[in-house]
């Protein structure tokens, strides 16, 4: 099992490359983007030292499936998936915010709530809520899109408009799409015995039209609970059974790492790496309802290059 942690392609018409935390994005002729989902894994805004075999393939295939399942809600950037780890799409001018939508009080929102915070991103939260409780209606809590190495910051709708990050008309569309996509994601999850707890969407503009970009409803961008036993666990105040990369965050915290200054990432043994890979495969199969088919990992970069070149030559 090999993992792809860095790419250095030179595709025809390539103008630039951006290396994100997990994805490497190649700009082709200022018209298309070749997005490679690597096997890098990040937690607490830090890229961990070891890659996770098959993770990129899983994320790319889940995102492609959900992009295809939501084209009636809003246009999206995807044109093709020439390789299991690659999506090629329309180059959009991205909004510098991530649209986060939460159906339940958990994660960072719960940590803030527990400490007395009753307003997140300008959204007032009801009193007396418990961890993992469902909100009366899903709430939208955007964040800024941080540069590599910096943390994303919460931002309110008012601040987004005041800073000119989106016009009122644009923001209304972003919010409408966000809630409609979350509703669809929730319905698809329910068919699989899952609860879509929270997720994030990114949008951009192309020729004046707002497009959904990047990945959607993947375990990297979303948190899922198992529906079975949710209510009992909630009533007893027990931790929910999660389908997300929370298990990676928990392992890091148990080993004294929370992404804070001066903390060192714990050593990731082959056994830890393999167990994370297996958990991701479980996520894939639960979320999609399909068996995960492992691609040959003997020479991933060569395979990707060949497949993308063939697509671009069309």
Swiss-Prot record:
A Pfam family recorded for this sequence: SAICAR_synt
Pathway, per record: Purine metabolism; IMP biosynthesis via de novo pathway; 5-amino-1-(5-phospho-D-ribosyl)imidazole-4-carboxamide from 5-amino-1-(5-phospho-D-ribosyl)imidazole-4-carboxylate: step 1/2
EC numbers for this chain: 6.3.2.6
Family: Belongs to the SAICAR synthetase family.
The protein's name in its UniProt record: Phosphoribosylaminoimidazole-succinocarboxamide synthase
UniProt xrefs under InterPro entries: SAICAR_synt/ADE2_N, SAICAR_synthetase_CS
GO biological process: 'de novo' IMP biosynthetic process
GO CC terms: cytoplasm
Ligase in keyword set: yes
Keywords: ATP-binding, Ligase, Nucleotide-binding, Purine biosynthesis
A GO molecular function held by the record: phosphoribosylaminoimidazolesuccinocarboxamide synthase activity
Recorded catalytic activity of this chain's protein: 5-amino-1-(5-phospho-D-ribosyl)imidazole-4-carboxylate + L-aspartate + ATP = (2S)-2-[5-amino-1-(5-phospho-beta-D-ribosyl)imidazole-4-carboxamido]succinate + ADP + phosphate + 2 H(+)
Catalytic class of the enzyme: ligase
CDD domains registered for this protein in UniProt: SAICAR_synt_Sc (cd01414)
Keyword Ion transport: no
């Amino acid at each position: 099992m090999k993992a792809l942690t860095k790419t250095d392609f030179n595709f025809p018409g390539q103008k630039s490359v951006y290396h994100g935390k997990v994805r490497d994005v190649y700009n082709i002729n200022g018209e298309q983007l070749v997005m490679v989902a690597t096997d890098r894994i990040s937690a607490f805004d830090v890229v961990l030292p070891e890659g996770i075999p098959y993770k990129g393939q899983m994320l790319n295939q889940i995102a492609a499936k959900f992009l295809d399942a939501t084209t009636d809600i809003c246009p999206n950037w995807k044109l093709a998936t020439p390789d299991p780890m690659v999506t090629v799409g329309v180059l959009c001018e991205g909004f510098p915010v991530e649209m986060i939508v939460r159906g339940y009080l958990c994660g960072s929102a719960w940590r803030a709530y527990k400490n007395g915070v009753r307003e997140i991103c300008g959204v007032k939260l009801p009193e007396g809520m418990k961890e993992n409780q469902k909100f009366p209606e899903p709430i939208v809590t955007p964040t800024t899109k941080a540069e590599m190495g910096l943390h994303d910051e919460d931002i309110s709708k008012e601040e987004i408009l005041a800073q000119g990050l989106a016009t009122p008309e644009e923001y209304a569309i972003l919010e409408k799409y966000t809630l409609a996509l979350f509703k669809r994601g929730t319905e698809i999850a329910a068919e699989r015995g899952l609860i879509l707890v929270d997720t994030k969407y990114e949008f951009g503009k192309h020729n004046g039209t707002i497009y959904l970009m990047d990945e959607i409803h993947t375990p990297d961008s979303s948190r899922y609970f198992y529906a079975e036993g949710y209510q009992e666990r909630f009533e007893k105040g027990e931790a929910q059974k999660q389908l997300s990369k929370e298990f990676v965050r928990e392992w890091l915290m148990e080993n004294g790492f929370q992404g804070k200054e001066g903390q060192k990432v714990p050593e990731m043994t082959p056994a830890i790496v393999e167990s994370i890979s297996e958990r991701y495969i479980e996520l894939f199969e639960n979320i999609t309802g399909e068996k995960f088919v492992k691609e040959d990992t003997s020479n991933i970069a060569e395979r990707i290059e060949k497949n993308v070149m063939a697509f671009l030559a069309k």
